[in-house]
A protein has these predicted regions:
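N-terminal mitochondrial targeting presequence
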Residues: 1-50
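Single-pass hydrophobic alpha-helical transmembrane segments typical
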Residues: 36-79
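N-terminal topogenic membrane-targeting module
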Residues: 69-148, 153, 161
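Flexible helix-coil transition and linker loops at the boundaries of alpha-helical arrays
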Residues: 79-80, 118-128, 160-183, 200, ...
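Residue at a conserved register position within TPR or TPR-like alpha-solenoid repeats
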Residues: 97-98, 141, 189, 196, ...
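Residue-level detector of the short coil/turn that links helix A to helix B
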Residues: 102, 145, 200-202, 258, ...
Length: 395
């Protein structure tokens, strides 16, 4: 496969990250170079592999986190609309000091005042609007790098939602509201998990707790509906891509802890939930490839362990699938995730060839990955390919 087939016709251009208000108007996940590439420096990781000095790339949740963040803004907060004027007046002030004239103390003051006025005039504390204000406050805390404060706000909202579901969710007149609040609680849990696992908090066990809850709750609700049927007025549950996002988020958390044997089945389930012809599916396939390659599964009595060559061959097959999927997607469906998946999976094929001792094939793949990265302006890909080629020159 030639490198030119692996890329879009035009080089990727940076897309400004949408403001919260702009994101609210969108109705489907859209990747952007700003979000994916901005995450790449953190999310592309080099891992030692066995006795080899080779290192491999993993698109460590770039698309998944974008999906979670999109869902967090577009589906949790909902459009800031239908606010009574006394509430809207204070909210406009809070947003002004958030987006126009950044003054954290003033912004926080007006967010709190907005919530106080909403309570005074009797707005439903579990309406999209009021929950949205609280989650916007958490998003602002994240924006000003007060990550623990953001988590604290979201934990309070999550606990309030769980309390409501436990006390009122089983009442027949509340079935639709229960669905809406449970969806939001799942998405809030995913966001909390993301924050806990981030480089500024680094609490993987707490992240795992929230992510496991989100996955189990999502699948349990899906199974209940399939078994019992959807109740009148209950409304739709999360779609397949949203369910896949929760699976991917948990997989990323296990991957970060080098628990690859736990991450792999989650990536596989996420692939099954993802549209077969999407760039994010290619990313997931690449991630599964790396997760499989790095596995050292715990021994099971009475079962022979999977051999290293078998794991590498399986990993190679998934990397090839990632390239095939990304190659055959054309604009407008094609996004920069396809380009990243192509470049990274190509580099990883070089790693697999190097592990097999096929230096010529490895060099070919590293050169191809470097060329792809150059066209994209992906500096991390270029530097890693250069490092791999330098390593080969010493063999």
């Amino acid at each position: 496969m030639s490198g030119t087939r692996c890329l879009r016709q035009l080089p990727v251009r940076s897309v400004p990250r949408a403001t919260i208000q702009e994101a609210l108007g969108q109705r489907r996940f859209q990747s952007s170079k700003g979000s994916t590439y901005g995450a790449a420096k953190k999310l592309f990781k080099a891992y030692p592999y066995s006795v080899s000095l080779a290192s491999m790339f993993i698109l460590f949740g770039a698309g998944g986190l974008v999906f979670v963040n999109y869902y967090y803004h577009a589906y949790i907060i909902g459009a800031f609309k239908q606010f009574p004027e006394p509430v809207a007046k204070e909210l406009r002030k809070a947003l002004y000091f958030t987006n126009q004239d950044l003054k954290p103390h003033q912004a926080i003051k007006f967010y709190k005042k907005t919530l106080r006025v909403a309570e005074e005039i009797g707005m439903d504390p579990f309406s999209d609007e009021v929950l949205g204000i609280k989650i916007q406050l958490a998003a602002f805390m994240e924006k000003i790098q007060k990550y623990h404060k953001a988590i604290q706000v979201l934990e309070i909202v999550r606990n309030d939602c769980l309390d409501w579901i436990e006390e009122f969710g089983d009442k027949p007149e509340n079935v639709g509201k229960r669905t809406r609040i449970l969806e939001k609680t799942v998405a809030i849990s995913l966001k909390i998990g993301e924050l806990y696992s981030g480089e500024y908090v680094k609490e993987p066990e707490l992240a795992e707790e929230k992510l496991v809850w989100a996955v189990e709750t999502t699948l349990r609700e899906l199974q209940r509906r399939e078994t019992e049927g959807v109740k009148p007025g209950e409304g739709k549950w999360l779609n397949r891509e949203q369910i896949g996002a929760s699976l991917e988020a948990l997989g990323n958390n296990y991957e970060a802890q080098d628990q690859h044997y736990l991450a792999s089945p989650l990536f596989l389930q996420a692939i099954n939930m993802s549209p077969p012809k999407s760039c994010h599916t290619a990313v997931l396939m690449n991630n599964l490839s790396i997760s499989v390659a790095q596995q050292t599964p715990p021994s099971i009595p009475g079962q022979a362990p999977v051999s290293r060559p078998t794991l590498v061959n399986n990993a190679r097959a998934w990397a090839i699938k990632a390239i095939d999927v990304a190659t055959n997607i054309a604009p407008p469906e094609r996004t920069e995730e396809c380009d990243l998946a192509c470049a990274v999976a190509t580099h990883n094929l070089g790693e697999f060839a190097e592990m097999d001792g096929d230096i010529a094939a490895a060099r070919l793949k590293y050169d191809e990955a470097k060329s792809l990265s150059k066209v994209m302006g992906f500096t991390e890909g270029i530097s890693n390919a250069d490092a791999a080629l330098k390593r080969l020159s010493k063999k």
